[in-house]
Amino acid sequence: MTGTNTFNNADLSASIPEKWGSMMLEQKFPEFVLQDFASDLSDMIVDGDIVHVPNIYTNTFTASTQSTPGTEVTLQSPAEVDVTITVDTQKYIAFILDDKTMAQVARSYNLSEKYAQMAQKTLLRELEDALFGLYTSLTATALGSTIAAIADLDFRSAIAYMEGLEFRDGTAVFMGVKTYFNQFIGLSKISPNYASNFGVVASGLLGNSGQAGTQVKGVAYGIPVFTSTRVPSPTAVDKNVMLHSSAYGFATKKLQGSSKVRTQMDYKLENLGTLTVCDIVYGVGILRAEAGVVINSLSTSTVA
């Protein structure tokens, strides 16, 4: 029997609570793979604003022939080249959480810490983008194709270029995610992460060897391959790079301990709230322009 005048949600709305759980949907960030790989010169810039790295390979020795016994030897003094990185780019993120609002916000969310972490990772992403942007200064930028998918020959040509310049160890590849998953992973010479034990990275090719096994996506011809959403892709052409660790250099000012990003908090009476400022001071630059090669690929292409 259907009753009449039964209670419904509208009748009981004053007694039905709305709940907020502990879950919070947070911003996603890339893995900072290039910061872990490039030459970190931060320890050199405790004071000052320019890092100097002597280049003794541009001007080199040549072998002399001793034609006449007893003849005085010919001395050589190849000039060094001064390679510099200026560390003076400062970026920051600042916000205030006022007392009234924070007294009303659920404490389980720990908003101050969450927003500080978001700001820190945003600034680290700026550094990652600056490093990826250095591809335009590499000597070799024309491998691959701007109108087609990456091919096995493109990868082997990059290896031939690197080994032709004596770069055999300490090399890695950084690819756009579309190039890797829609094109490159289908090549027979690639061993994806799930199919390999990665002895090649066990020695800690990256600065943080604990992350190497999780960040690396595959190994091709013995070279670890990493992916990143920060690989530049002008006009839908991914600028994938094969790099030696000495190709790119960067430095950050250690404003707070060993962290790249400094976080400061200060209560502001005039604002009745807590000010949080995160900042980073960094510089990036090419150390060896010939120690890397751009492998172009059309990011919209697919390979079955």
Q: Language-model segments: what does each one mean?
A:
Residues 2-37, 42-60, 84-88, 106, ...:
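Sequence/fold signature of self-assembling virion shell proteins
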Residues 95, 173-174, 276:
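Well-ordered beta-strand positions enriched in small/hydrophobic/aromatic, beta-favoring residues
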Residues 101-169, 294-304:
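Alpha-helical scaffold segments that mediate packing/assembly in large oligomeric complexes
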Residues 79-105:
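Short acidic, glycine/tyrosine-flanked loop/strand segments centered on an H-E-D-like triad
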Residues 137-215:
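Extended, solvent-exposed, turn-rich assembly/linker loops in the middle of proteins
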Residues 58-81:
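Active-site-surrounding "flap" and adjacent substrate/cofactor-binding loops of secreted or lumenal enzymes
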Residues 89, 99, 175-177, 280:
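Short, structured patches in soluble enzyme cores that scaffold and shape functional sites
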